[in-house]
């Protein structure tokens, strides 16, 4: 139970402190996720893996993130947004560091799965936390900027990989993951739970019953909540099928099929991710001005168009330009996704609903890396990217036709 004293810790600038920690949390989340992509070829060679087995490591990651996100969403509603952010960071930091000690495919896969439980719950907890701190007028701009933290993490991982792997090997890259433990400890002491969540825990009758009743039961008893949950689960499934399939295999595609050397590839990926940051931030401005629905569909369908262009029309002269434009479009759906979803559900079930819908979708997306691995073994990674483009098109059409924006205000309990 939260007291008036705890609620009084929230001042006019508290949301800025919360934003700083949430941004850094998503930065390390994104960096941790990309460590596998850049070390995949080295791990594949050392453990003598097939292409399908290499893809399965990405699928283990997504399966862990899915289960972690579903549980983390429920835990956010039950125990608090900040508390789950802290626990998530501690979980994936310690276990990811342990990946550097593994000696086989099975050891790596099992430990990666458990580390990914923290990766999945962190994304839901951070976005729910900030949605409840930021006023509606600026919410998408702030949350879009927050999503850029993930992409800054990609760049950090890219630079670390280019620096460490060629001279020190892939294991050292994973040892670095222990550093965010310090940040988790500091966040525990400096960031209070948002007022809307605290109030929902103090309110008598209805909110108390919500805590005692299964949140998933509350979601599926209400037709509106049930429909939103199903639509968002479908949208999230296609979004993540495309996003993680491309994210997991793009470095390998540039190396193996376009013939880039490792350091050259990392430079190209930095350019792509820099454009992605811009896409996420501008998506926030666009969504506040033009609407969540339009901006989301524009980014998803634009990405669907550009994936085949990269595969069929790339050349040494234009590949950088194609990757930069692709990176910009690729970032837009995630710049809007958090706000769009959080405004689709009421406070009492928000964490559970978002975590459930997003991560039911992620379970479907867990097959994406292995799917591209299978297609690559019989053809090319590029063929898999075309399939990912089709998934992006569908994920843009569903919300454009069926999901209204601004259904609930996250600042209201």
UniProtKB/Swiss-Prot annotation:
As for subcellular location, the record says: Cell inner membrane
**Presence of the UniProt keyword Oxidoreductase in the record:** no
Q: Where are the transmembrane segments?
A: 17-37, 54-74, 86-106, 113-133, 146-166, 172-192, 229-249, 267-287, 294-314, 319-339, 353-376, 383-403
What is an example of a GO molecular function annotated in this UniProt entry? carboxylic acid transmembrane transporter activity
Physiological role: Probable uptake of muconate.
Family statement drawn from the similarity comment of this UniProt entry: Belongs to the major facilitator superfamily. Aromatic acid:H(+) symporter (AAHS) (TC 2.A.1.15) family.
This chain belongs to the protein called Cis,cis-muconate transport protein
Organism field: Acinetobacter baylyi (strain ATCC 33305 / BD413 / ADP1)
Which gene specifies this protein's sequence?
mucK
């Amino acid at each position: 139970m939260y007291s008036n004293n705890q609620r009084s810790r929230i001042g006019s600038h508290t949301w800025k402190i919360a934003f700083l920690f949430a941004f850094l949390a998503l930065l390390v989340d994104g960096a941790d996720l990309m460590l596998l992509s850049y070390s995949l070829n080295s791990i594949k060679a050392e453990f003598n893996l097939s292409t399908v087995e290499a893809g399965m490591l990405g699928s283990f990651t997504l399966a862990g993130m899915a289960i972690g996100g579903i549980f983390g969403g429920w835990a956010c509603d039950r125990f608090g947004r900040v508390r789950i952010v802290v626990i998530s960071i501690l979980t994936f930091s310690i276990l990811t560091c342990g990946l550097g000690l593994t000696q086989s495919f099975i050891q790596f896969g099992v430990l990666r799965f458990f580390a990914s439980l923290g990766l999945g719950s962190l994304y839901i907890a951070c976005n729910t936390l900030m949605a409840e701190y930021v006023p509606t007028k600026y919410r998408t701009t702030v949350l879009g900027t927050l999503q850029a933290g993930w992409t800054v993490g990609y760049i950090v991982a890219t630079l670390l990989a280019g620096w460490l792997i060629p001279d020190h090997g892939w294991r050292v890259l994973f040892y670095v993951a222990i550093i965010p433990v310090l940040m988790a400890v500091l966040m525990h002491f400096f960031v209070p739970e948002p007022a809307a969540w605290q109030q929902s825990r103090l309110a008598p009758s209805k909110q108390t019953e919500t805590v005692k009743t299964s949140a998933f039961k509350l979601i599926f008893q209400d037709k509106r909540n049930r429909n939103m949950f199903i639509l968002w689960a479908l949208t999230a499934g296609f979004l993540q099928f495309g996003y993680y399939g491309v994210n997991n295999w793009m470095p390998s595609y540039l190396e193996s099929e376009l013939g880039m050397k490792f350091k050259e590839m990392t430079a190209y990926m930095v350019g792509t991710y820099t454009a992605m940051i811009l896409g996420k931030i501008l998506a926030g401005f666009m969504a506040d001005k033009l609407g969540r629905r339009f901006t989301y569909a524009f980014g998803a369908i634009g990405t669907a168009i550009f994936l085949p262009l990269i595969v069929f029309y790339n050349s040494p002269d234009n590949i950088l330009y194609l990757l930069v434009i692709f990176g910009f479009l690729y970032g837009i759906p995630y710049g809007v996704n958090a706000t769009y979803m959080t405004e689709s559900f009421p406070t009492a079930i928000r964490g559970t609903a978002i975590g459930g819908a997003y991560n039911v979708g992620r379970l479907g997306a867990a097959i994406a890396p292995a799917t591209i691995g299978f297609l690559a073994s019989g053809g090319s990674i590029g063929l898999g990217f075309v399939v990912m483009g089709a998934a992006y098109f569908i994920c843009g059409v569903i919300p454009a036709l069926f999901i209204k924006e601004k259904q609930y205000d996250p600042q209201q309990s």
